[in-house]
Amino acid sequence: MRLTALFVVAALALTPPVSARQAVQTAAARAWAMPERELMVPVEGGRVWVSVNGDLKATAAPVVFIHGGPGSTHTGFGGLTALADQRAVILYDQLDSGMSDHPNDPANWRVARFVGELEAIRKALKIERWHVVGHSWGAAIALEYAASYPAHVASTVLGGTFISTPHWILGTNLLIRDLAPQVQRDILACEGNNRPPAEKCKAAERAFSAAYNGRPDAPPRSPEAQAYRKRTQGKGFNEKLYNAMWGPSEFSARGSLVGYDATPLLAKLDGKRTLFLVGQYDEARLDTVRDYARLTAGAELAVVPGGSHSFGAERPVETEGLLRGWLARKDAK
């Protein structure tokens, strides 16, 4: 395992030799570009919305981004359309999320079916090999896909790495211990049978998020980001789906993912083409993700300085620089 980046200068140094400055300028100019092509791809259970920016026939392999949740949308990746100056950037909403169909049938809420969506998109776009980037719940889908379809994967990025519910809950409990004593007590009470008033629980959740998932120093959304989200958010976050698969609380799993653990699949990855990517203050604890990287021979680990679980929104330039450099290096091999 190699630790790729702990500081901004290191992150930007991973951009191609053409220069980090040029990459930053490109990101500013092309981030949050509206979709150049949109299509609805048939999958098991309905159709998923897909957008493409950039040239699918470019020399550099396309990259697809897989959003978290379950039940969230692709919009958190909108700034990464900046990468379309070198390769096709593919974004999509999972079934029952955002711009995709919303049958809201719990029979569809299975890991294998979500993995199947990704393969259906690849076939619809006639892509032979692509880079697969997942974040949070999307990292689990990326891992499952890369383990099942290695011939079609140029590289795998597991961002804000969720691949095991037991590990995630253990990590969350450790993170809670670093919060203010009163916040710790409130969270424990809110997870118990005699819950305090709802506002106290919401305040405790906000305190946790401010530390690990949406830090207060995040830059405000640009006009371009706001316009992009308004245009492509669709029906937005699906709380029913989230609660069914995870549960109503960030601090405990009560849904169908309660026993989920894909850690054994790490052994099936091509480690030299695998990057673990987390924020410095990520809800996905660095110690846990470092262990995952050690289980994946040859894998790299990159840390976005100053970022939490929402590192892409909080540190967009650093995130774009890391990904740009990683994708270029894996294209060359």
Give each language-model segment a name.
Residues E128-G171:
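Conserved hydrolase catalytic core segment
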Residues T156-R195:
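Flexible "cap/lid" loop of the alpha/beta hydrolase fold
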